[in-house]
């Protein structure tokens, strides 16, 4: 009977979880504290001043603050790369019989944001065929170099396709429809071929970035699923992206057909430092017998276990999340005051370590409860903490280790966002190519590099650049070395010459 009740309780918890995923709030943020359970860290109430205070009975409207770059009264902001088309509005006074009595002394400017439909341009290179009058010899200038030999695609359209597919998540079949509507006839297979060839050109850059990232003292690593290739008719294989985040704000997406430890061993071969992860067992197996690697644990994943137990053990789960919440308040203070190095370490030791010690003591006391069954979500959360105490404390002794892997999880969002549009990869090669291009585009975002300008440059530069110096083409290095004088497409050069 007890077993039946336990099974029934677990099924109810699973049903509640599915309802939450479908209809409920997915964020772990607590919108408001439950007033029936006072905070563990309530500050003392301030002593009321005995001096009588004046009561203000009117309200003063606060003036609206505008950003420095605000150029119009509506708040429209743009930089110098945005084209501006000027439309002259004639003054009626200058059109009539008395026009000679008026003169223009100034202009009032009104600006409105407008949009042209997505457009494509065919570049026609006209090369004269020259004949020598005496010898009758014919000659002509060579065609400009293209990204692909004898290719029909300008670098601008290749970069645009990659940006549309992997930044804005527009599948190629929709891009193909847009081409047709613009009057361009190309097969979808051609677009796929162009995409694959362009990514293959970029692969050495992504590989070089992985080697740079592995030089970091602290790495963050996670995994996320992707369907790639057919397991059987009507069913796709489950494969995995394993992103690795380095200390210089660079991320590398690696891919594996499995979620086993072997991939971690392969990708992190030779790494020495601290590895920040969630509680997945593959990472524990990886660091076993590796004294040169320290495993650190993510506090956000720890909090998630208690969040899942809220409906079953509301009061205890709330208390646990209050403990962890105080750690995050300390991290906010560190960030606001821009603490680094020893100052950051001292602050964590003084303010966060006592909270961690108190939290572990609280967890121990909760585990002594005789009414807490092993199947209870709170029991699982407490066991999780007990099994990872050492890893959860690593960030207290190393200022370069973050409290969680949220910075990595934010970069991961491009994968589920892409899945909602292109659903899966047809084959495993396609999954590897997604990993390659997302490595570069996501790092562009982290480095505040315009991804379109970056791709236009490196797709032209990669075949001319020395292979031994390919690391210079990674987004972080490219920003310092080439961004100021990046290569343009022929279309962009035409646009500049017209102005």
Protein language model regions, located:
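Short, flexible loop/hinge motifs at secondary-structure junctions
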Residues: 1-152, 191-192, 220-221, 227, ...
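Mobile genetic element proteins and their domesticated derivatives, centered on retroelements
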Residues: 24, 93-95, 132, 161, ...
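Acidic/histidine-rich catalytic cores and adjacent linkers
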Residues: 280-282, 319-499
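Conserved beta-strand -> loop -> alpha-helix junction used to position metal-binding or nucleic-acid-contacting
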Residues: 218, 274, 287-322
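Conserved catalytic alpha/beta cores of large enzymes that bind or transform nucleotide phosphates
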Residues: 157, 162-164, 176, 304-344
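Gly/Pro-rich turn-and-neighbor structural signature
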Residues: 75, 83-98, 173-266, 270, ...
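Short helix/loop capping segments that flank catalytic or ligand/cofactor-binding pockets
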Residues: 103-105, 140-142, 228-230, 252-254, ...
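Active-site-adjacent "gating/activation" loops or surface patches in catalytic cores
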Residues: 119-173, 242-251, 415
């Amino acid at each position: 009977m007890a077993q039946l009740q336990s099974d029934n309780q677990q099924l109810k918890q699973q049903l509640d979880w599915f309802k939450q995923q479908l209809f409920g709030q997915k964020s772990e943020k607590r919108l408001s504290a439950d007033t029936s359970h006072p905070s563990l860290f309530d500050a003392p109430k301030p002593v009321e001043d005995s001096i009588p205070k004046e009561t203000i009975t009117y309200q003063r409207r606060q003036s609206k603050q505008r950003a420095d770059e605000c150029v119009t009264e509506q708040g429209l902001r743009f930089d110098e790369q945005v084209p501006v088309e000027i439309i002259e509005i004639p003054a009626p006074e200058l059109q009539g019989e008395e026009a000679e009595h008026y003169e223009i002394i100034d202009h009032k400017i009104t600006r409105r944001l407008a949009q042209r439909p997505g457009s494509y341009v065919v570049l026609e290179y006209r090369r004269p065929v020259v004949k020598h009058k005496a010898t009758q010899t014919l000659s002509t200038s060579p065609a400009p170099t293209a990204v692909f030999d004898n290719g029909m695609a300008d670098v601008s359209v290749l970069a645009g396709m990659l940006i549309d597919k992997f930044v804005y998540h527009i599948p190629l079949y929709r891009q193909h429809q847009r081409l047709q509507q613009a009057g361009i006839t190309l097969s979808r297979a051609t677009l796929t071929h162009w995409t694959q060839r362009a990514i293959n050109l970029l692969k050495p850059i992504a590989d070089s970035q992985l080697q740079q990232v592995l030089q970091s003292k602290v790495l963050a690593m996670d995994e996320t699923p992707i369907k790639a290739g057919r397991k059987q008719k009507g069913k796709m294989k489950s494969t995995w992206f394993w992103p690795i985040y380095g200390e210089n704000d660079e991320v590398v997406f690696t891919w594996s057909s499995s979620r086993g430890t072997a991939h971690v061993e392969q990708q992190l071969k030779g790494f020495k430092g601290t590895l920040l992860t969630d509680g997945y067992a593959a990472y524990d197996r990886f660091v076993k017998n590796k004294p040169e690697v320290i495993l650190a644990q993510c506090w956000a994943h720890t909090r998630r276990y208690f969040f899942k137990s809220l409906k079953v053990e509301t009061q205890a789960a709330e208390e646990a999340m209050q403990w962890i919440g105080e750690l995050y308040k300390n991290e906010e203070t560190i960030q606001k005051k821009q603490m680094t190095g020893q100052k950051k370490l001292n602050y964590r030791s003084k303010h966060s370590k006592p909270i961690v010690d108190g939290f572990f003591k609280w967890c121990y006391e909760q585990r002594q409860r005789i009414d807490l069954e092993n199947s209870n979500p709170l029991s699982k959360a407490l066991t999780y903490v007990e099994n990872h105490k050492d890893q959860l404390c690593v960030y207290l002794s190393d200022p370069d280790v973050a409290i969680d892997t949220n910075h990595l999880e934010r970069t991961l969002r491009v994968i589920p966002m892409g899945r909602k549009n292109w659903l899966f990869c047809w084959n495993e090669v396609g999954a590897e190519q997604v990993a390659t291009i997302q490595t570069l585009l996501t790092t562009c975002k982290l480095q505040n590099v315009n991804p379109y300008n970056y791709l236009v440059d490196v797709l032209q530069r990669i075949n001319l650049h020395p292979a031994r110096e390919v690391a210079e083409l990674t987004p972080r290095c490219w920003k310092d070395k080439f961004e100021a004088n990046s290569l343009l497409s022929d279309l962009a050069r035409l646009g500049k010459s017209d102005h």
